[in-house]
């Protein structure tokens, strides 16, 4: 079973946003509480984060599908749904995030560096958030949107200052074990090293990292052997050290021919453009500082071979060191030479001012609508396809089982200018309109949207209980009516009081009282006769 994986294909999906809630507030003595549906929670994001404790991508090799949690639905009483939890995926330092076609998305260097691999979908609005002066009690809510889904490629490129390159069994693993505390696998057969090994070297006051990669053979840049698979690990290195085998027993090999083959493979290898310097240029591997280490000089023929090829190498401009990983001969001088190159590279980076990118201002055009309409033809019939972030997002948020929600979508599209643009494109009632790409929503277009919410008994976005709310008297009107009633009562009392003072009430009462005894005695007045 593999214990080291430096390239995986990861399938990530953000969480889906929660749906908004449709609810009406219910409380004692408040018959018209209004909408109180809460918003849905946002879906969780999938984030890649550099973790110094992670050294391989093995976990994602066994479990390549990762999904963040979904957002919770909204609830009544203005309660919003729970946001989905963010899924943090730890990756080693030096991980490069790419698309399947090779486009670099991020280069994760530095502890804690993060990259959002898949964003979660936003939650839908509840009917409380959708209410307005014209739409006081919406009977619908918006749906949550699915999170982003993508397939990304993770490639691990080791962070090292110096890279050891050479043929298999040249002694690279023995050299890194002798110069650092690393303990790679060492054996007397080719391709013992199957994974990159890192070691930390201290030379004076300079501390740097060296990388041992699997051996290179002729044709490694074309994929032969293991070199092409692991050459990416030397792309970040500031310098290279050619480890040449002076004790080889193969008749067709010698240090000079090995160096020529390795240099040719390095020249053919195309360095990733994401490792461009501060000036925007990529330094090829064969143009970087290089040292030559003639290894195995402790063998009987190794010393003679090193002395034989050294003048030729020095004449080519190489700094040559005769070393032995077994007896540690020449390792101190080689270590200080590496430290000198590393220090110079670090000083050059520190002295170079950071490149400041001027902000690019792209003001929105005055006539920019945020969408476009493309006219197509299907089955000899015209088809109009509406494309744009807003229309596509609005369609995903619409509950097409709710006529009021469809009417709300029609209002938004009309306000955006889609209907006017369809008229300009020559659309006629009954033509097919598709919002989105191949998987878009298909409509039979009607300019007045008679197939939608206009057929409702009440206006779009209203509650029938609020239909007569505009006819109810206001508090001021009620006060005026009460004052009018008080004035009318006062006027009636004043009129009665005036009649009483005028004696009208006294004469009529005295007359009725005088007539009552005569009726009781059986006598009548002259008028009655």
UniProtKB/Swiss-Prot annotation:
Broad class of enzyme this protein falls into: hydrolase
Matching Pfam families: DUF1967, GTP1_OBG, MMR_HSR1
Region (Disordered): 466-529
Xref: InterPro entries: G_OBG, GTP-bd, GTP-bd_Obg/CgtA, GTP-bd_prot_GTP1/OBG_C_sf, GTP1-OBG_CS, GTP1_OBG_dom, GTP1_OBG_dom_sf, OBG_GTPase
UniProt keyword annotations, A-Z: Cytoplasm, GTP-binding, Hydrolase, Magnesium, Metal-binding, Nucleotide-binding
Residues holding GTP: 166-173, 191-195, 212-215, 295-298, 324-326
All copies of domain OCT, residue ranges: 363-447
Name this protein carries in UniProt: GTPase Obg
